[in-house]
């Protein structure tokens, strides 16, 4: 029993909550003399006519379908996300004019895995037209030649005039499991450095393209067009029919096709005239013509780094001269034609501090 229930029981004994009935203003009721009517109720209860009763009276029911249930989103494991391609526009403060074209919730929202359902053909994509995939069953997967292993799967050869759900031949390519690389390795071992090469190996330098003044020479390239040769079959071996099912057998026919031996690579060297003189450098004008010299405020130039002051020797100070200090006349220069104006600052705004000051940033 909770503590709240205990407190309520204790309060009922000490201070019971008894409220008087609410006082309401009495309304004077008008009395009218009415004649009492006695209604005779029939003991037979009214019964809703069933569908079987209607059919007995030769009544045709048109469009008798069950009402569609609302989609139960509660309890689903997926989230409600927008369907791919759904456009929702919202302008704050502007009422939508398209009041008549309202879309349902199922049209806008969908499951989170809607694309995966489309791939698997589940959910709402379970019905409707779909492409029929031809299901093929391989009747025999045995290998009568153990020294060869299959390289490709069995591919069925279906003719256009073949009947539906009929047996069709298959083709499979097999290759030997172990190959002798002694002969092929001897053929591939070719000395890449030929006697006609003018540059010793490891000393060739690739010049940049801008250093070449002469145009590239176009060498004639011989293009040979070969006609497709017919496949050469060395040996054809017809094996016995292997029974697979009652009344069905599989017959294997082996075709031995020769494979061309790998040809060694051939190196071709050609001499080309390459100029080794570097290209001329482009001489640009002074940068002052592009970027004018401007005087910056000391606040824009930053502060010098802190340098530890060197140990100074004490020197006898000179006595101050009693003469009057006269400033030397400054030589005025004409104003430069720059974008920023020439400015003069107060002597207190000096770019070079008189003493080394440590500034902590």
UniProtKB/Swiss-Prot annotation:
Monomer. Homodimer. Exists in equilibrium between monomers and dimers in solution. Interacts with the histone-like nucleoprotein; this interactions bridge the virus core to the capsid. Interacts with core protein X; this interactions bridge the virus core to the capsid. Interacts with the endosome lysis protein VI; this interactions bridge the virus core to the capsid. Interacts with the peripentonal hexons. Interacts with host NPM1; this interaction might play a role in virus assembly. It is found in: Virion; Host nucleus, Host nucleolus. Induction: Expressed in the late phase of the viral replicative cycle. GO terms for cellular component: host cell nucleolus; virion component. This is Core-capsid bridging protein. Signal peptide: none annotated. GO terms for biological process: viral release from host cell. Residues 311-331 are annotated as: Disordered. InterPro entries: Adeno_V. All late proteins expressed from the major late promoter are produced by alternative splicing and alternative polyadenylation of the same gene giving rise to non-overlapping ORFs. A leader sequence is present in the N-terminus of all these mRNAs and is recognized by the viral shutoff protein to provide expression although conventional translation via ribosome scanning from the cap has been shut off in the host cell. Belongs to the adenoviridae core-capsid bridging protein family. Residues 311-321 have a biased composition (Basic residues). Pfam families: Adeno_PV. HAMAP family: ADV_CORE5. It comes from the Viruses. Its main location: virion. Keywords: DNA-binding, Host nucleus, Late protein, Viral capsid assembly, Viral release from host cell, Virion. One of its GO terms (molecular function) is DNA binding. Associates loosely with the viral DNA to form an outer shell around the nucleoprotein-DNA complex and links it with the capsid by binding the endosome lysis protein. Dissociates from the viral genome during entry. Might be involved in nuclear capsid assembly of the viral particles through its association with NPM1/nucleophosmin.
């Amino acid at each position: 029993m909770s503590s709240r229930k205990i407190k309520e029981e204790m309060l009922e004994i000490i201070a019971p909550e008894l409220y008087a009935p609410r006082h309401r203003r009495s309304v004077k009721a008008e009395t009218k003399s009415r004649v009492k009517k006695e209604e005779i109720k029939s003991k037979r209860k009214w019964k809703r006519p069933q569908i079987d009763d209607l059919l007995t009276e030769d009544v045709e029911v048109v469009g008798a379908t069950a009402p569609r249930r609302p989609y139960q989103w509660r309890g689903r494991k997926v989230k409600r996300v927008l369907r791919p391609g759904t456009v929702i526009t919202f302008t704050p403060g502007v009422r939508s004019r398209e009041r008549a074209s309202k879309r349902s919730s199922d049209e806008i929202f969908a499951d989170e895995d809607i694309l995966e359902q489309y791939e698997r053909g589940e959910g709402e994509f379970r019905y409707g037209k779909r492409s029929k995939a031809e299901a093929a069953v391989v009747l025999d997967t045995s290998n009568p030649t153990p020294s060869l292993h299959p390289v490709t799967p069995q591919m069925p050869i279906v003719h256009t005039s073949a009947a539906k759900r009929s047996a069709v031949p298959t083709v499979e390519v097999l290759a030997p499991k172990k190959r002798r690389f002694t002969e092929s390795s001897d053929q591939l071992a070719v000395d890449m450095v030929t006697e006609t090469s003018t540059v010793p190996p490891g000393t060739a330098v690739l010049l940049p393209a801008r250093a070449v003044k002469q145009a590239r020479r176009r060498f004639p390239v011989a293009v040979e067009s070969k006609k497709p040769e017919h496949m050469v079959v060395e040996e054809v071996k017809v094996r016995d029919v292997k029974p697979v099912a009652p009344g069905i057998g599989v017959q294997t026919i082996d075709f031995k096709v020769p494979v061309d031996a790998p040809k060694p690579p051939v190196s071709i060297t050609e001499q080309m005239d390459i100029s080794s003189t570097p290209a001329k450098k482009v001489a640009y004008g002074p940068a002052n013509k592009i970027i004018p010299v401007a005087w910056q405020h000391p606040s824009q130039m930053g502060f010098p780094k802190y340098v530890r002051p060197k140990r100074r020797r004490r020197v006898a100070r000179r006595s101050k001269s009693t003469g009057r200090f006269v400033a030397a006349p400054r030589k005025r220069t004409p104003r430069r034609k720059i974008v920023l104006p020439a400015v003069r600052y107060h002597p207190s705004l000096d770019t070079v501090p008189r003493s080394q000051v440590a500034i902590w940033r």
